[in-house]
Amino acid sequence: MEFGVIGEHLPHTFSPEIHRLIGDYAYTVREMPPEAVPAVLKERAFRGINVTIPYKELVMPYLDEIDDAARAVGSVNTVVNRGGRLIGYNTDVDGLTALIRRVGADPAGKPALIFGSGGTAHTARAVLKALGASEITTVSRHPQDGAISYAEARTRRAALLVNTTPCGMFPHLDTAAFDPAEYPDAEAVVDVVYNPLRTKVVQQTQARGIPAITGLYMLVVQAIAAAEHFLREPVPPARAEAIFRRVRQSKENIVLTGMPSCGKSTVGRALADALSRPFFDADEEIVREAGEPISALFAKEGEAAFRERETAVIARCLAGKTGCVIATGGGAVLREENIRLLRQNGRIFFLDRPLDRLTPTGDRPTASSAEALRRRFEERYPLYCARCDRRIPAGGSVEEVVKAVKEAFEA
């Protein structure tokens, strides 16, 4: 192994893709149990490695030198082999500092809460101290060494909330370390989780009009800092933004909403082909799981039960996917929960096809006649507009709509 990352569980790491964009060097992912880590360090058969949870502290006794920032934090995420000497660094400090600045937060002279008490929490404490936070409090399920409980945290005032726990991380997408509504003084929220692209707590915070950000930019910046140690040469600062945008776009889903018969499935398949992405149709996933057509499910269960089924399928089968094109059912927009789930990794495009270009069909229970279609259009149109990231006029040909979505997504 020339360069790479070691950790216990790394099936969904973004690091290889990021390092491919940084430079022309091989970067390997190696999962291993704790007992295998010492042998890797003793053998020293690498030029440089990143170290991820839960080994950032475990590696430290095996290093010949640890830089001051890593020693202050108490953990190492980058190890470089310099002529047989292992030197440890913590580039998470660089990444988290950049992430806090990116969200627009200024912790100077203000109180902050850190949720979690692991290695990343120690990094957050060091970063917030360097940025001048007036009071830094750790929140833990098992409070000790000055940490407080989650119940006590809800009584504290804080301008910046930093989540360092794995709450909300794939595949546990519907979890959150805290409810931002319980922290009315919060000016910003930083969540170090990077998968999904928008965690539950970040979406909840943004819905309140408060700046919030997940950890992908931190991951990119710390990777660049690690690469500079690996290669002993600087990476131009502008590369961070370019790499961040490339990785985010490659992972982000294109989610299509709109009325029945507006062309979501047809456009979605053509778009997926054009972009070489997998395609998923929410209605097809429902039918596949249920073993019955949607019209039969409506007739047997009623609309309320069908909507429950639809949300369950979105949560279980679609929300965690990345780099896909997803066509939703016409009524998926009715539930805000569906939109939140789909936004975790997706950007939502409303295919706005004029009412006179829509066609009622018997296989669409809520739009089986011209009158029913008109009623649905009038009821749902405001929701389609409110619950999308971009409205795409869809009165033209499939090719024209595909081009419009593609251009909007890549802009």
Please report, for each region that a protein language model flagged, where it lies by residue.
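ATP-dependent small-molecule kinase phosphotransfer cores
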Residues: 284-340
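Adenosine-phosphate binding glycine-rich loop
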Residues: 192-252, 394
